[in-house]
Structures are given as C-alpha cells and as structure tokens.
Amino acid sequence: MIRRMIHRMKPRVMASAFAILLIWVSAAQAVCNDIYVDLRGPWGQARFAVEIADTDALRAQGLMHRERLARSAGMLFIYDAPTEPSFWMRNTLIPLDMVFVDPTGRITRVHANAIPHDTTPIPGGPNVLMVLEINGGMAALLGIAEGSELRHPRLNQRQAVWPCE
C-alpha cells in the first residue's frame, strides 16, 4: 500500500519540482532583461524600463518631441563600440539626466537636468558604450553618480562589473 502511494506521488512530486524549476528560471531571466536597466551604488538600487536606441536613426531621434516620460522609464543609447559621444537637447521638451556608462557598466559621468531645447553640446567623455537618459533630477534624487554600476544584457558579461545572473 505504501509503495502504491509513493508510486502515485512520484508524478506529482516531479511535476511540482518541474514547476518550481520553471518559476526559478523565469525569475532568473527576469533579473536581466533587454527592456530594463538596473543601477546600484552605495545609495541602493533602481530599475528603469527602457527603450533601446541602438541605430544611428534611433540615437538621432532620442527622446525628441516627448511631452513626458514615466518616472521609472528612460532611453538607453547603445553604441557598437566605445565612443566619445556628445548630446544636445534640440527638440527635446523635458529636462533629462544623462548617465554615461563605460563598457564594464560603470557610470563615468552624470549630466544633470539638461535644459530643454538647448543646443549646447553635452560631452560624455571617452570610452562610453551606453548612455541612459532619465527624467531630469532623478539621478540626484536616487543618488546615481560616477562610480555607480549599471546592469544590462547588452554589456559584455565577462567584463561587466555587475553581470547578469
């Protein structure tokens, strides 16, 4: 009788174990997803839902003509190779913080509260692979600063200071 009970339980146990494994794998994949960037530093952690700008056309358009940006949203500019980018705010209607990121995911510079419509160049400095644009003032509010770390699957995970899990 006990053998029968154990035999009947095996499929249920296996199904439960498989379901738990699927949930665990899904959760692990959700940790690092192309539509999010995670940032961390001594101040804590933050996550932003991002649109990706990884072509010349998308990078040129950026966040121009947007009347608002959700508090936890941004745009992630991704370059094919490290570069020395320069941004401006022409046709940009909202103030933005620009977070410049090196190939390891380390933040090298934060330009706070870029002024809407200002055509003054905003240099990112050398060795920039990504730039995260978020609402103006958000970096200061959260504590995002030079030395903070960004996690995203498009970084080379072997070089990343905070690799995807």
Which positions does each model-derived feature cover?
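Bacterial N-terminal signal peptides
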Residues: 15-25
